[in-house]
Curated annotation (Swiss-Prot):
The keyword Magnesium does not apply. Transmembrane segments: none annotated. Its main location: cytoplasm. GO terms for biological process: protein repair; response to nitrosative stress; response to oxidative stress. InterPro entries: FeS-repair_YftE (IPR023742), Hemerythrin-like (IPR012312), RIC_family (IPR019903). It comes from the Bacteria. One of its GO terms (molecular function) is metal ion binding. The keyword Membrane does not apply. Keywords: Cytoplasm, Iron, Metal-binding, Stress response. One of its GO terms (cellular component) is cytoplasm. This is Iron-sulfur cluster repair protein YtfE. Belongs to the RIC family. YtfE subfamily. It is found in: Cytoplasm.
Amino acid sequence: MAFRDQPLGELVLSIPRASALFRKYDMDYCCGGKQTLERAALRKELDVDAIEAELAQLAEQPIDKDWRTVALGEIIDHIIVRYHDRHREQLPELILQATKVERVHADKASVPRGLAKYLTMLHEELFSHMMKEEQILFPMIKQGMGSQAMGPISVMESEHDDAGELLEVIKHTTDNVTPPADACTTWKAMYNGINELIDDLMEHISLENNVLFPRALAGE
């Protein structure tokens, strides 16, 4: 089956572990989920045939859960518990670790200077963003008023783009979240945590942008 003409966001929903594959190739399937596989691969100068072959192998496996058929209320509850609550735990700990690493290893050329600042910016943006979703947008959708939520959804999508841009800054600051050979235990643990955060946040944004919001706007 040809996957190159399909949007990344659709492929993530229909193929098990496609999200991990796209993350490996640094392809944006959440904020950039509407771009086709071919376009995304060309932008990164990647071999679309090779990626398509890997997707074909993944597509042979059963998908864990097809969110395209799950009730919107259940999706919202899942987003809050799996992602919102998790981000609220992840970011304060990562900020503490980044502050320590930047202070202790200030004399090293490889230190991720500014990382604590960027993580703090992401924390502040996400804290405000998630509160707005939980207090305004999600209740509207649960009450069947999603088709009237074009304004709030547009704002949320714009804020998703802002978060995606901050993730790119964080990846640039951390050498694509790769610790140097002489990194201490805290440094390595922090980068593991940042990779987990990036995975979680991309899945979170993808589920909202590519499933929840379109279905809500369609009147479900």
